[in-house]
Amino acid sequence: MELANICNATIAKGIAVQKDSYGGYGVYIVDPGALVGCNDPKLGGDKIELLRVSSVFNVKNLMEAMNALEGEYAEDGQRAADMFKSIIGSSIEELSAVSETCLLVYFMMVIYLMGEQGYAVPMKISRYIDTVLLGTTVNNASNCIESMLIHYEHVALFHELDNNLQKLHKTLISKMPSKKNYSIELLRQIYSATVSRVLEIPQELHEENYMDNYVVTPSLVPILDYVNHGDKTSRNAYYDVDRRKGDIILYLDLTVVNPGKLKPNTEVLITYKDIEDSLAMITKYGFDPANYTTTGTKIFSCTFDKMYLSTNKFDNEIDIRNFYQWFSINPSLQFVLNSENEWLINDSLAEFERLLVPFATSSQRNEHYWIYSDGDDARKRFMEYFDIDEVEDEDEAWAQLETQFKWFESSENDLMPFPPCVWTVKSKFLKEKEATGYELEKVIQNKLENSRALYNETTNQFQAYLENYLDYRIDVLQEYSPEDTENENAVSQLIARELSVLLKIRDRINNNKSIFLNSEDKKYAKLPLLPTKNVERPPWLSEGDDDFDQD
């Protein structure tokens, strides 16, 4: 294929890129017989080279390729190299906080637009953009972000994605030499194609000690980026780096497959990670593989609807949304698919125990219960905490502080940049009659860890609250009609996945089955959490000010 020639890729006989079952493309073994006997004893005899790629695109080598134009195209090359340096150099400050993958998207956009404006750009990069990044339709979250924010407004991940897209677009418009209003749809296309294809490639820092000195770099690897992801039971290949040449190589793994027994058109599949994150898959690729049982781990995370948490108070008194804000508790649940193909709540996470804290209220109301107070008691505690009891105008200092924390309470931000002085607890666990702040949370957490009776009572109260939430959320999801998001696959896939998981959890509750993983396997305590939402800026910060401190 033309792209292989342009990008210096070598493809083994019997291998081809073809349409896959999800509407995209994959790499297939169309003629297994062509691979029989191709294993090289010098490589250990347990693998066959299917693909070798010399041209890899990442931030570093895109910069190098554009700088190299100075010596390749005389004046045109110098002009293009200077323009690229100018655009990127002036963009660094605006893009200092974005990920390296976002920078890769930005570099690709700049190179593409420079080519459109008549600047000399490297042919292989230009062809890759035209053929792959612009020629691949990926119905992932970035291509339907408006609909995703309508249906999942409460999920911080999609606000973060939207903010990244807006930041890249705004920077692009302001830095390109032609002040055209470049379409954000073009950016979304390149963004969606890039994030769905990017691979984490290890890069050597010091040749003499490679294993201890390398970084993982988000990279686009032509042809290899057509290879799809499989679980541990279907994976039959893996990629590696040729340390001597720097090439990326795709190997057929002969420890798991025998090419002589493969059927024609067997798909080549690699495993990216041991953790299969349904939400991440839908966000990046626009689809979620079916349930399966593997030696890996499949998870699904969802964020509570914060309006529900605020309007449906626990015990008719505790505003769960407000409580989670003040204690900076991530308002998300993580579900794990166990070996019996059942979705269960991951209660091994430290953050899950923090979710339980507001529910650690005795039903008898005589042992311990939470109290919210933003009046004189809160004022006293704030003044003591900030040591501002000797200011000239204490009333004015308190008024300013109260205005600020009230603004945060009503904002969409999940984290509060103040100590939780408005929340106190009356408890027989404490020597004092009343305590407050993060120390208070630690006391309750310690009691939860060391009192099985209290833990059971707390989880029961949490489950009762969750059961009502499930009824509410399932009703919302079941009102969804696919026509609402026609051709926006990521939205419909995410709704279907969340609905499926929540229905299974509710069924377990109705059948008096445990909904908790209750595993002693330490790997479950380290699974990744969803990000928290912190996108609104306080009105007392001007546009040029640094973001407020959330620590």
UniProtKB/Swiss-Prot annotation:
The keyword Methyltransferase applies. InterPro entries: Ctm1, SET_dom, SET_dom_sf. One of its GO terms (biological process) is methylation. Residues 184-288 are annotated as: SET-like. It catalyses: L-lysyl-[cytochrome c] + S-adenosyl-L-methionine = N(6)-methyl-L-lysyl-[cytochrome c] + S-adenosyl-L-homocysteine + H(+). GO terms for molecular function: [cytochrome c]-lysine N-methyltransferase activity. Disulfide bonds: none annotated. Residues 46-273 form the SET domain. Keywords: Cytoplasm, Methyltransferase, S-adenosyl-L-methionine, Transferase. It is found in: Cytoplasm, Cytosol. The keyword rRNA-binding does not apply. PROSITE patterns: SAM_MT59 (PS51611), SET (PS50280). GO terms for cellular component: cytosol. Its EC number is 2.1.1.59. Methyltransferase which mediates trimethylation of cytochrome c (CYC1). Belongs to the class V-like SAM-binding methyltransferase superfamily. The SET-like region, although related with the SET domain is not detected by any prediction method. This is Cytochrome c lysine N-methyltransferase 1. The gene is CTM1.
